[in-house]
């Protein structure tokens, strides 16, 4: 089963086409990762999946229906998005920010309910941020803040969670912390995770499904072990490398080369 499908999807701004005639299927209940060079359209594609950018042509299909034929409230109850570098209102506490995830369920007839409170508390527990609930968000570390933002998307209680570079500007320890959390949410709670990552090796380790975006379309898609090879890295990133098995996780491991090749280093030694 698929969570999100694109059919002949073309995206752009004004006269510039960013994505052209893209057909992909992102599996339900899995972790999917979009990879590609800077400016290739990964973030643009994620915006279209979240109904934040209308296609120039084609469609994004959610639950068997064109996402742009569904109401904003209906889409917000099916998927949540965490953009790059979100800003929290000054002075807002962790619990107040996480509570904003319940906004799609509020209207003038339905105010804050016991269910809303329960979902917020559950999201805090799932992300290990319940002990931080009364602290200001701007007083937290980078890893803590990212977990709080993820908690807000969980409070929204959607089947699909979209994340645009959730590890950006985090140190390595916090990158692993965030990615472990996302995988746990997928495996233990059945969330469909779709995210953009720049680190190829972490993408291979955490992804069930991978889409390589290049030349305005999907250059390859499938399990990392099936699609990631030296030819793909050369084409998509214009980078020479060797792909070897990760000795611990048994996923593809990319060893990139710069101007100095391995044999040159060996000769110098």
UniProtKB/Swiss-Prot annotation:
Location, primary (coarse class): membrane
Keywords assigned: ATP-binding, Cell inner membrane, Cell membrane, Ion transport, Iron, Iron transport, Membrane, Nucleotide-binding, Transport
Matches recorded under SUPFAM superfamilies: P-loop containing nucleoside triphosphate hydrolases
UniProt KW Transmembrane helix keyword: no
Residues given in the record as ATP binding sites: 36-43
Signal sequence residues: none
Membrane topology field: Peripheral membrane protein
UniProt record, GO biological process: achromobactin transport
Localization, UniProt: Cell inner membrane
Superkingdom of the organism of origin: Bacteria
Example GO molecular function: ATP binding
Domain ABC transporter residues, every copy: 4-240
One cellular-component annotation, GO: plasma membrane
Claim: Iron is one of the keywords in the record: yes
A Pfam family matched in the record: ABC_tran
CDD domains named in the record: ABC_Iron-Siderophores_B12_Hemin
PROSITE patterns: ABC_TRANSPORTER_1 (PS00211), ABC_TRANSPORTER_2 (PS50893)
Family: Belongs to the ABC transporter superfamily.
Function summary: Part of the binding-protein-dependent transport system CbrABCD for uptake of the siderophore achromobactin. Probably responsible for energy coupling to the transport system.
Protein known as: Achromobactin transport ATP-binding protein CbrD
Gene: cbrD
């Amino acid at each position: 089963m698929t969570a999100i499908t694109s059919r002949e999807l073309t995206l752009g701004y004004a006269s510039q086409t960013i994505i052209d005639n893209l057909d992909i299927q992102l599996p339900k209940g899995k972790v999917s990762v979009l990879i590609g060079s800077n400016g290739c359209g990964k973030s643009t594609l994620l915006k279209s999946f979240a109904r934040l950018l209308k296609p120039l042509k084609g469609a994004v299909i959610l639950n068997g229906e064109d996402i742009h034929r569904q109401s904003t409230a209906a889409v917000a109850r099916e998927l949540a998005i965490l953009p790059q570098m979100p800003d929290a209102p000054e002075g807002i506490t962790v619990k107040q920010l996480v509570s904003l995830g319940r906004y799609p369920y509020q209207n003038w007839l339905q105010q804050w309910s016991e269910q809303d409170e329960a979902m917020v508390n559950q999201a805090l527990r799932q992300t290990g941020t319940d002990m931080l609930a009364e602290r200001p968000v701007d007083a937290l570390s980078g890893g803590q803040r990212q977990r709080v933002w993820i908690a807000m998307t969980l409070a929204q209680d959607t089947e699909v969670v979209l994340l645009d570079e959730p590890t950006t500007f985090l140190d390595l320890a916090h990158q692993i912390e965030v990615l472990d959390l996302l995988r746990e949410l997928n495996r233990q709670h059945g969330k469909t995770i779709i995210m953009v990552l720049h680190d190829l090796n972490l993408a291979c380790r955490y992804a069930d499904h991978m889409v390589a975006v290049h030349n305005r379309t999907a250059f390859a898609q499938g399990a990392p072990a099936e699609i990631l090879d030296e030819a793909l890295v050369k084409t998509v990133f214009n980078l020479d490398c060797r792909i070897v098995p990760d000795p611990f996780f048994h996923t593809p491991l990319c060893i990139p080369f710069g101007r100095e090749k391995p044999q040159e280093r060996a000769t110098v030694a």
